[in-house]
Curated annotation (Swiss-Prot):
Cofactor(s) listed in the protein's UniProt record: Mg(2+)
Residues annotated for AMP binding in this entry: A215, K216, K220, G239, G313, E344
Species this protein is from: Mus musculus (Mouse)
Binding residue positions for (2R)-3-phosphoglycerate: V23, D24, F25, N26, Q38, R39, S62, H63, G65, R66, L122, R123, H170, R171
PANTHER family: PHOSPHOGLYCERATE KINASE, PHOSPHOGLYCERATE KINASE 2
MF annotations from Gene Ontology: ATP binding; metal ion binding; phosphoglycerate kinase activity
Protein name: Phosphoglycerate kinase 2
UniProt modified residues of type Phosphoserine: S4
GO biological process assignments: flagellated sperm motility; glycolytic process
Residues recorded with modification Phosphotyrosine: Y196
Taxonomic placement: Eukaryota, Metazoa, Chordata, Craniata, Vertebrata
């Protein structure tokens, strides 16, 4: 799947066309008020481009939360998003109380020129995800004939399909793979994601460094194996480092995370790294806590001293910070997935914060730096570095699957150039 070969919005003739666009308006809400409008703002360039280039209408569809196929307008309606869009675009936005069916089809068939229409939450229908729950909470699967009808109804709402929701591209849902129109293009947000990930996965600049953190080795096996075929260096930190250090150095790790299942793969991973000439770097010293708690007593440890019984490693220490900085300084391309300490707590945030500072410095020296979404993106938000790295991904799960070498159904479904 060549990411760089997919049809993009700027290559589509939109004049007089109705555009149906999958966006990611899954925004945090409190009492029906939007608490962070970042995802709505991120979709504006694609919407504006359509209107500026003569599109007849832009019909927007999204999910919000996990209603599991049950209509819950009191809790998960997209209506507040319509109001937010109005103020961001300074244009009227028509909100429809459903996303499919005769009334929706009629409203979208021949709207006024330049109309912006927002559909109600796609996940109020079990046919969007293909599975959900009934009113008693029992898991159910959607009837295939009804899924087909749902997709056919969505397909009637536009002449051109645009997907600008990278965050759901790893899901084969009706709105990501089931809209059947002759032209299916990526929006600008999706294009930026695909451009950056193709830089890393198709023709990487070298030296190429992957920084992998997180808790369990077994959750990252596929990621580690795939990246070992691409990178020159790999920093392994976070909770999963303790499984490696116990297996490889027989280090005493106290009550630190140990992943029994992941431990069985360590030897195979190291053999692959050696065969591919990849240098893997582990922490050599640690900041420890006497419990998993923000107010834990804080201690220090090294590989030689080990971590005492009952204590756990929650961050890397000053020596490791220095080593990480030296590796980062050599790289021309960096992909970072997963923090290397419990960054939410100040006592155990130094390792991740120091690494972030080095990655920012590398970016200003011309290194391309890509932050996989999820927790690492949260680190960027916490320390205000979103604009100081090359790219912060908007999709945690989607970016992880790409880096694991998987094909994303929502990208696969787009037209080729």
């Amino acid at each position: 799947m060549a990411l760089s070969a997919k049809l993009t919005l700027d290559k589509v003739d939109l004049k007089g066309k109705r555009v149906i666009m999958r966006v990611d308006f899954n925004v945090p809400m409190k009492n029906n008020q939007i608490t962070n409008n970042q995802r709505i703002k991120a979709a504006i360039p694609s919407i504006k481009h359509c209107l500026d280039n003569g599109a007849k209408s832009v019909v927007l569809m999204s999910h919000l939360g996990r209603p599991d196929g049950i209509p819950m307008p009191d809790k998960y309606s997209l209506e507040p998003v319509a109001d937010e869009l109005k103020s961001l675009l300074n244009k009227d936005v028509i909100f429809l109380k459903d996303c499919v069916g005769p009334e929706v089809e009629q409203a979208c068939a021949n709207p006024d020129n330049g109309s912006i229409i927002l559909l109600e939450n796609l996940r109020f229908h079990v046919e969007e995800e293909g599975k959900g729950k009934d009113s008693s909470g029992k898991k159910i699967s959607a009837d295939p004939a009804k899924v087909e009808a749902f997709q056919a109804s969505l397909s009637k709402l536009g002449d051109v399909y645009v997907n600008d929701a990278f965050g759901t591209a790893h899901r084969a849902h009706s709105s990501t793979v089931g809209v059947n129109l002759p032209q299916k293009a990526s929006g600008f947000l999706m294009k930026k994601e695909l451009d950056y990930f193709s830089k890393a996965l198709e023709k990487p600049e070298r030296p190429f460094l992957a920084i992998l953190g997180g808790a369990k080795v077994k959750d990252k096996i596929q990621l580690i194996k795939n990246m070992l075929d691409k990178v020159n260096f790999m920093i392994i930190g976070g909770g999963m480092a303790y499984t490696f250090l116990k297996e490889l150095k027989n280090m005493q790790i106290g009550a630190s995370l140990f992943d029994e299942e992941g431990a069985t793969i360590v030897k195979e991973i190291m053999e692959k790294a050696e065969k591919n000439g990849v240098k893997i770097v582990f922490p050599v010293d640690f900041v420890t806590g006497d419990k998993f708690d923000e107010n834990a007593k804080v201690g220090q440890a090294t590989i030689e001293s080990g971590i005492p019984s009952g204590w756990m490693g929650l961050d890397c220490g000053p020596e490791s910070i220095k080593i990480n900085a030296q590796i980062v300084a050599q790289a021309k391309l960096i992909v970072w997935n997963g923090p290397i300490g419990v960054f939410e707590w100040d006592a155990f945030a130094k390792g991740t914060k120091a690494l972030m500072d080095e990655v920012v410095k590398a970016t200003s020296n011309g290194c391309v730096t890509i932050i996989g979404g999820g927790d690492t993106a949260t680190c960027c938000a916490k320390w205000g570095t979103e604009d100081k790295v090359s790219h912060v991904s908007t999709g945690g799960g989607a970016s992880l699957e790409l880096l694991e070498g998987k094909i994303l159904p929502g990208v696969e479904a787009l037209s080729n150039m």
